[in-house]
Amino acid sequence: MGFRKILAQDQKDNMSGHDSTQRQKTLEGATAGRFVAAITVAALLTLGQGCRTGEDDVHRWANTAQGPRKLVAVLTHDKYPMDLRIEAAETLVSMKPRGGRRIGIQGTDEQQGLVDALAQMPPAPRTALIAKLVPNLQAEMAKPAPVQVVGQPAKTDMSVPYKDAAFAILTHEDGALIPDEALRKSVRASLAQWCTTNFADRLEDSSQLYGVEQVLRELKAEGVRNLPDQILPNANKLDRLAELTAELGDAETKQRAGQKLVDVAKFVNSNAWVAQKRPGVEAANKASKLTPTEDQLKGQLAQYQDEELLRVFSSMKKIGGKAVVEFLLGFVQDKAAVEKRRVAAMAALQGNLDRNSAAQAQIALSLAGDPATPDPLRDLSLARVGEFPRAMVVEKLYELFKNDKWQVRWVAASLVLKMSDTSQVQEFMSKLSSADGLAITEPLSYGGLLADLKGSTPPAELAAKYSATGNSVPARLTALSYYYAAGTPADISKIESFLKDGTAAPKCKADAKDCEWKCTVQGAAGSETKEIKTVGEFVEFCVKPALDKRAKGLSK
C-alpha cells in the first residue's frame, strides 16, 4: 500500500510536471507566434516604406541610366500623387543633355521623353496634368536671364529647357496637347516674352532645341509685338530685330519699329554719339599702342559713325513705313551731310517710297537734276524715280535730257526706255533728237535697251525705221546700235548701205568728262582705236565689227 501511494504520488508528480511542461511549451509557442507575426508586420511596413517613391528618388533618377524610364513611369501612372507626377515632369525637363541630346524632353529611339509620354496618355488625365505642369514651366521661363560679362565664360541660361518644353508641348500635333484655348494663349504670350527678353543673347544660344527665330515664326505677329522695345541705341542684333519685325510684324508693330529706328539714327548721327564712343576708341588705340593725332582720332570716329549709321539705314530699308521714309527723304536732301551717308539713305528708300506720291517723286527728280548732286547719289535718285509710274515721271525725265552733264541724260534716257514699250519709241526718239553733246556710250546702250522692248512692233522693225536718213542723228545712231547689240550676220546687208554715210556724228562738249567718240577695231597689227566723225564711220568701226565677230562665232 505504501508502495502504491508512493507510485501514485510519483505518477501525480510526473503528470503535474508534464502538464507544466506542456503549458510552458504552449506559452512559448504562443509567444513565438506573436513575435514572428510582429516581425512580419514590421518587415512589411518597412518594405512598403522602402518602395514608396518620393521626390528624392525622382531627383536622383535624373542622373541614372534608367532614370528617364522611371520618371516617365511616374509621370504617366495615376497611382502616384499629382504633385509627384509634376515633379517627375519637371525633372525630365531639367535633366542635363546626354550625348548632346535633351532626352528628358525629346526621348530616344528606345525611351520616350516628356512630350511623347504626354501624347500617349488618355486625354482627360493628360489635360489635368498639363494644366498644372505648364504654369510651372512658365514660372521658370520668367526667371531673369543671367547677366553675361564680356571676356568671361558665358553663363548658362537655366530657363532654356523650360522654354523648349513649353514650345514642344504647344506645337505637338498642331496643339493637341493643350486643348484649352486660354492656356494655349497664355503659353504663346510667355514664349513671346521669353524671346524678346535678352533678345541678342538668346538669339545666339545654341543650347536651345528650338531657336528664337523658330519660335517667333510660329508665333508670327504676336511673337514680335514687343521687339520694337529692344530697338535702342547701341543695341546688339539691330539688323535681326528689324528683319524679324519686317517679316512677321503687323502694321502697328512695324510702325513702332520704324519710329524707334529713326530715333536710333538721329542719335548715331549726333555729336552725343561721338562723345559716347570716344573713350572706347581711345582705349582701343591705347591697347593697340597707337597714338593718333586729334585729327586722326576724329577721322576714326567719323568712320565708326559712318559704319554704324549705314547699319541703321540697312535696318530701316527692311522696315520702311512713314517715319522711316520721311527721315530718309530729309536726310538725302541735306547737302551738309556726308556724301556716303546720303547715298546710303537713298539706297535704303528702295521699295519703300509711295508710288502714288508725286511729292516723293519730285524729291528724287530734283536731286537727279541738281548739278551739285554727287554722281553716286544722282544715279540712285534716278533709280528711285524708276519706282514710280511712268506717267507720273516721264516728262520730268525728258527735261533731264537737257542737263549739262551727258551722264545725267544717259541715265534718264535709259530709265525712260526701261519704262517704255515699242509704242512709245517715237516719243523717245523725238525727245532725244534735241539732245546736245552726246557721248558714244549713249546710243550704244540705248540700242541694247531698244532690243529688249516689248510691244506689238518688233524692235528690228523699229531699228530699220529709225536708222534711215530723214531721222535725227541721235535717233539714227540709237537705231543702228540695235544691230551692234542684237544684230545677226543676216543684218550685215542692212547696214552696209550706211558705210559711206558722211552725216556728221555728234561732238562732245568741250568740258564733258569721259565723253568720247571712239571705237576699237582689230587690224593686222592688233587693236586700233578709231575716231568716229561720221555716221558711216560709226557703222564701219563700231557696228559692223560687232556683227562680223558674231558671224565668226557662229561659224565655229
Tell where the protein language model's regions lie, with residue ranges.
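N-terminal secretory signal peptides that target proteins for export/translocation
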Residues: 1-31
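Hydrophobic helical h-region of N-terminal Sec-dependent signal peptides
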Residues: 35-45
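Structural detector for internal amphipathic alpha-helices that build alpha-solenoid repeat scaffolds
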Residues: 53-64, 83-97, 116-121, 149-182, ...
